[in-house]
Design a protein with these regions (language model features):
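ATP-dependent carboxylate/acyl-activation modules
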Residues: 43, 184-185
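Rossmann-fold dinucleotide-binding core
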Residues: 1-67
Length: 185
């Protein structure tokens, strides 16, 4: 805190649309006094703010959330490709999800985007891969095994290496589609 400066780190969760309408989720880490001084400004950016005493805790919370998103999309694309190969209409699968405890807005949004072949980015493959990689590194530094996200990381690396890094993260479906010899529509 040389020269009286205080530093905050505020990773966010949400898309560009949520940034535009001020409904991001913010994870703020750092000096508590500084946080309270600028909290009213941060409230204009998001619908909910969580304060963490350390910068690292705020960063890891964001990475934890994005690892859940990666897990959801990996499960979704796997199910859609398997279902398509078995002759199941992907829209029927999304409808079944909508009536179950498994339903989540992300699954419906990304499932529909996949079926409609709309990979316009809301969050790039390469950006989610970066967060997955940071989570794997953070977990290793803390001595926490994360075998599931390490496998998901491989899927995202394949998508990036195939040239889809600037597409929406649901474009990872193309990796499994190529291997299965089908396209989810």
């Amino acid at each position: 805190m040389q020269h009286g400066c205080r530093f905050l780190h505020a990773p966010v969760l949400g898309s560009t649309a949520q940034a535009a309408d001020g409904s991001l989720l913010l994870f703020v880490g750092g000096n508590e006094e500084a946080f309270h001084r600028v909290e009213y400004i941060l409230q204009t950016l998001g619908k909910k703010i969580w304060y963490f005493p350390s910068l690292e805790q705020a960063a890891i919370m964001k990475l934890m959330c994005n690892s859940m998103i990666a897990g959801l999309i990996a499960s979704l694309v796997q199910a859609l490709v398997l279902g398509k190969k078995a002759g199941i209409d992907p829209r029927t699968f999304l409808e079944v999800l909508s009536f179950s405890q498994l339903n989540a807005p992300t699954l419906q949004l990304k499932g529909t985007a996949i079926i409609e072949r709309n990979f316009s980015p809301r969050f790039f493959v390469e950006h989610l891969l970066k967060d997955i990689t940071l989570l794997v590194e953070a977990a290793a530094s803390l001595g926490v095994p994360v075998p599931v996200i390490e496998e998901i990381q491989k899927l995202f690396i394949e998508a990036k290496n195939s040239g889809w890094e600037k597409e929406d993260y649901c474009a990872v479906v193309k990796v499994l589609e190529q291997k299965a010899g089908i396209e989810v529509r």
